[in-house]
Amino acid sequence: MLYLLIVYVVSVDRVNKVHKYLKTYLHWQQNSVFEGEVSSSQYQRMMSELFDLIDPDVDSVMIYEFPEKYLQKTILGIEKNPIDFIL
């Protein structure tokens, strides 16, 4: 399993499609930030389909991968959308 943090800046006409798509795999944190755990096959499928949704000449999607055993998250201020539980 991979733990991902995805941050994106995409054109206004694609932002809702990207947001809705990422919600099928990951937990929305705030604005254009998603995080969560995916399997290797989910990761491959997600990258392929995400690439089809964006325009690589205009849009930017940054994907950070973390081994789960090294994951530590610190939040300063209010947490916009807390994760109640992780399966």
Q: Which residues make up each language-model segment?
A:
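Basic nucleic-acid-binding interfaces
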Residues: 1-5, 10-87
